[in-house]
Amino acid sequence: MTERMIPIMKRSTKRLFSLLLTVVMLLACVPAAQADSPADDGVMREGLSAIELTRLMGNGTNLGNTMEACNTNAIAPGNSPLTYEVGWGQPVTTQEMLTTMKAAGFDTIRIPVAWMTNATTLAINGDYIIDPAYLDRVAEIVDYARNAGMYVIINDHWDGGWWGMFGSESAETRQLAMDAYIGMWTQIAVRFADYSDYVIFESANEELGTRLDENSVYCNDSVTTYMSHDEYYALANQINQTFVDTIRMTGGNNEQRFLLIAGFNTNIDQTCDERWQMPTDTAEDKLLLSVHYYDPWSYAGASTAAGATAWGTKADFEYMDQQLGKLTKFTQQGYGVVIGEYAALPGNDGLKANTLAYHKHFLDLCDYYDLTSTLWDCSGMFVRRDLAFCDADLAALYGGRNRATEEGRDYAEIQAAGRASADATIAAAPVTFVEDAIILTDDNAVAWLMWNDGGWALSYSVGDDYNPDSISAGMKVTDAEITGPGTYTIGIDFTGTQQGYSASVAFAAIGIANGEVLYPGYVINIKEVKIDGEIYRLKGRAYTTSDNQVTTRVNLYNEWVTSIPVGNARMLGGGLGGATPTPINRNDPEIAQIHTIYITFEYIPQR
């Protein structure tokens, strides 16, 4: 067992509740934050359901990179809250800023917060009393939002990775994590107990899932090799249930407050898994679900507009429609759904092509599927220093989609308009942007080289779905239509990109769409790899596999695969000796700058 990085104090349940009682008594001596917020009347609207609430929340945004900004390399209790607030480049939050955001079309503000790292000594001595000054500053920002007439979401947001304590090898550390979680939310809930139902608590950000065994300054013995997905799900469910129970136990308005439950990794597909469950609740119709949407990451999450893959084909718009439609699983059960983060994130070189179309289609579908959302923004779109959008079209989009513009319209009308607009967008979208692209049908198979460069700046069709439009500008690809057993060549030329080469590799694989369906049992036998015209020798043997039983795959560099999938891997001759998911060694000198890469392989039945 590795040495733990924080002193652990043994805590019994009796000690926890004794500490929380002290916290409650201390907070009772602090003037209620609600008293400083004249616009918040403390009213809890009787009979208001979670679905009805989300319709009232309109469109929202995040106060990104602000109160969650933290530095785990220099934890210094007692720093001024403003030290953190501006630490990641954002300006000091003001009343004028929130009022202008509301006027710009945002009816809801999500305030991400790093409570443990910025406002407790959990990493130093295992204590989790929140610094009153930090709590005061968050409350002050909440008051700004309430004065502006906005709904407010408060969460605990990554927060230095302390969540990995839940997955520690030490039962003592795991118990401390749960004690700290209960203690944190008790303090927050008591502080905001008198606020109206315009203030919503969110159980986590993206941490309830595979990050529950993340190593950090808080814990370096997380059980990354021991926790199964079933255990991840069970633990995430337990934490969410603890969140609900903790808030309800604080009484007052918190007995009926709307609570936002973070989905599994906030991923739509993983949250729709039957292993993930919404918590039980003593309040009726007061639970909301939180998920995020950044698909595809090669476009929405690309660090530069120049390096982002193309987006805007018929298939792209249809995919967004299908993904958001999956959330009806929850709305049909009466849960409100908040997409707590989404965006075609601006690159460091500006907005991406089709940003407006991405956001408009997203908002149309939210109208149709009865969802609300909060844009992830760190002054990339609404520039807080300027108190204005960076783009007139985005300003018009959000300015025309707020709650005020929907006044007097019933939901059926809004829903029908959203569906009609989305359908028109899909109908007008091109099938492909790529000239001479191979069109995949149910009756053919296509081979291609999936790729992410080492800086995640360049990408081509990563994933099991073949998409020739998912390509960074300037890349030229050679794909191959599979017509039967034979020899084929695929590859990529990076010389036309802005940087002129692929800076190493972060992920690479050969894919054959429909390979498992049309050619079951076939193997990909690599004959030759050429990088910049020279033969490159693979380090180990590549094996054939499939993640979805539709697309055949050979991993060339996939560091996320930690073991060979026995039973789902095959090679010529039947054995798996020498098999590796990383036959390309990214430390080889010829991998540092790749201008061209071509791979020739046989596609033949396994012998």
Write out the residue ranges for each language-model feature:
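Catalytic domains of carbohydrate-active enzymes, especially glycoside hydrolases
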Residues: 92-114, 323-330, 363-365, 372
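Acidic/histidine-rich helix-loop elements
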Residues: 64-93, 122-130, 173, 298-319
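Active-site region of glycoside hydrolase catalytic domains
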Residues: 175-309, 325-344, 368-371
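Aromatic-rich peripheral "rim/lid" segments of glycoside hydrolase catalytic domains that contact
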Residues: 349-433
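An active-site-proximal structural segment forming one wall of the substrate-binding cleft
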Residues: 88-109, 119, 124-158, 162-203, ...
